[in-house]
Amino acid sequence: MRLRKGDTVQVIAGKDKGKTGEVLRTLPNENRVIVEGLNMRTRHVKPTQEGETGRIVTEEASLHASNVMFYSTAKKVASRIELITEKDGSKKRRLKKTGEVID
């Protein structure tokens, strides 16, 4: 998976299509990402202690990695990521559309 925590992504499919957000967490075994403020789900939580009341919690659900694309905030464009190897042997990520090196 080429996305990392802290990357800005744009949703390209689903109910939140076109929205952007920051990756909070990646789940590489499942090929999914959790994006801040997107794909919200409502969960009803029962009280766990005496005197506590139940509540309704909204939280981010995961999105499949194929439904999001890296978003360049500098160029305002979504693009695929390619991995390149520098002459010193270090690996970098680069945007296919703009050629911008991410890290």
Curated annotation (Swiss-Prot):
Part of the 50S ribosomal subunit. One of two assembly initiator proteins, it binds directly to the 5'-end of the 23S rRNA, where it nucleates assembly of the 50S subunit. One of the proteins that surrounds the polypeptide exit tunnel on the outside of the subunit. The keyword Translocase does not apply. CDD domains: KOW_RPL26. It comes from Synechococcus sp. (strain CC9311). The keyword Ribonucleoprotein applies. Belongs to the universal ribosomal protein uL24 family. One of its GO terms (cellular component) is ribosome. It comes from the Bacteria. GO terms for molecular function: rRNA binding; structural constituent of ribosome. Keywords: Ribonucleoprotein, Ribosomal protein, RNA-binding, rRNA-binding. It holds the Pfam family KOW. This is Large ribosomal subunit protein uL24. GO terms for biological process: translation.
